[in-house]
């Protein structure tokens, strides 16, 4: 991502085993990296002759760690928060980091990777929950993975309505994209928490407040889905 152009952010941690860098990065202010990203966006827009009226769509988990900095640099940003079962999030993050890190490092422990990405995912979610309390409702929307998987048109209509955009001109392109990806669908990425020294109970306990606060459907330890609803 463009934030990484400042040698800042967890992209590098997902590719190399660099705990010293991770500790340094955690203590660095994020605003300079986001200001640099804003300048890069201006440069890209100018070079591609993009209309300033066309919004940028930026997606990276890094933003969850840096929401105050992001909103300082982009105060009018509209935020789309996507939600998924933490079991899948942590397992996927650990697997991604593991498969990238083993390319560049000779001695990598999968359990160390699992522990670090559980910690980092918890930090991302905690910071997001804290900042969400002060973000106006008109500036943020929540989209659930299961809802998108079950009825993507309705979910995308909600997003477009939130952004004040007409979805109709874009629907055909979305449908064609899904048709192409379905035709060339690869073997699903498989992983397990146990591979990375983690357990269902540990992850569930770590993110229980999150799943309750955002009505996230979590799978039970047996693999069955259970709706977790926020208490009144």
Where are these regions (language model features)?
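Conserved phosphate-donor/acceptor-positioning beta-strand/loop module used by diverse small-molecule
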Residues: 59-60, 69-95
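Short, well-ordered alpha-helical microsegments
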Residues: 63-68, 152
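Extended catalytic-interface subdomain
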Residues: 1-19
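Alpha-helical scaffolding segments of alpha/beta enzyme cores, especially the outer helices
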Residues: 39, 69-72, 130
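Loop/turn-to-beta-strand initiation segments
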Residues: 51-55, 78
């Amino acid at each position: 991502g463009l934030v990484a152009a400042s040698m800042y952010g967890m992209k590098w941690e997902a590719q190399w085993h660099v705990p010293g860098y991770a500790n340094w990065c955690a203590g660095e202010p994020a605003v300079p990296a986001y200001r640099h990203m804003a300048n890069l966006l201006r440069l890209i827009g100018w070079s591609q002759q993009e209309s300033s009226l066309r919004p940028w769509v930026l997606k990276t988990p890094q933003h969850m760690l840096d929401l105050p900095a992001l909103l300082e640099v982009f105060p009018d940003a509209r935020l789309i928060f996507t939600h998924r079962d933490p079991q899948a999030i942590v397992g996927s993050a650990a697997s991604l980091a593991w498969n990238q890190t083993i390319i560049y490092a000779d001695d990598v422990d999968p359990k160390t990777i699992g522990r670090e990405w559980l910690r980092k995912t918890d930090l991302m979610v905690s910071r997001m929950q804290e900042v969400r309390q002060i973000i106006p409702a008109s500036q943020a929307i929540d989209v659930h993975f299961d809802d998108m998987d079950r009825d993507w048109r309705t979910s995308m209509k909600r997003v477009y309505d939130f952004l004040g955009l007409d979805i109709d001109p874009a629907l055909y392109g979305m449908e064609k994209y899904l048709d192409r990806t379905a035709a060339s669908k690869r073997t699903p990425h498989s992983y397990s928490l146990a591979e990375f020294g983690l357990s269902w109970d540990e992850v569930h306990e770590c993110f229980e407040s999150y799943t309750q606060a955002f009505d996230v459907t979590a799978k039970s330890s047996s693999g069955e889905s259970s709706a977790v609803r926020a208490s009144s």
